[in-house]
């Protein structure tokens, strides 16, 4: 299976001011978005997989492009949010079940519904408490309950340093038309 737009690229866009295709599984640097792990879990069933994707507050975005509805659920791996808020998230897995832990407290165990194609390898967790930050751990288990994979995201601390270096090639133009 191949999907032309699986990686973001410069060129075709969805109206100004967008300069490229961004409804993909990989960003321009080939860094995977959380949805890429859904594809990995489906096409590499022999390698146990679990990966957390936090639903962005902005939600989903879909576009009608060449008479095909495309788009993606805006997911990220960020666990820095407003204290006391709740977030929904997905775990992408090819394991039998996933247990979700927030700061060490179990949010429950859900089984991977492999009988329904639209739900296979995707487990949805609604209104997960953020609290005051900390960590979220997804533990994938086989049918016997043995751990086969694990993924963890955590709240980042305050930045300690930022370094910026100017990059000023002579052919760049600040006219709104340059891709840089």
Predicted region positions:
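Short, solvent-exposed loop/turn segments enriched in Ser/Thr/Gly
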Residues: 175-179
């Amino acid at each position: 299976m191949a999907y032309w737009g699986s990686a973001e690229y410069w060129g075709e866009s969805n109206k100004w001011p967008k300069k490229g295709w961004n409804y993909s599984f990989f960003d321009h640097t080939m860094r995977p978005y959380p949805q890429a792990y859904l594809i990995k879990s489906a096409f590499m069933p022999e390698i146990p997989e679990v990966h957390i994707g936090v639903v962005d507050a902005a939600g989903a975005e879909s576009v009608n492009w060449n008479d095909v509805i495309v788009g993606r659920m805006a997911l990220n791996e960020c666990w820095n949010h407003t204290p006391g808020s709740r977030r929904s998230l997905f775990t992408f897995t090819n394991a039998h079940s996933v247990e979700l832990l927030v700061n060490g407290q179990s949010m429950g165990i859900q089984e991977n519904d492999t009988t329904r194609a639209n739900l296979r390898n995707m487990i949805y967790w609604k209104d997960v408490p953020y609290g005051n930050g900390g960590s979220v751990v997804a533990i994938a288990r086989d049918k016997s309950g043995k751990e086969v994979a694990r993924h963890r995201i955590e709240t980042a601390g305050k930045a300690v340093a930022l370094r910026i270096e100017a990059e000023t090639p002579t052919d760049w133009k600040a006219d709104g038309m340059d891709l840089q």
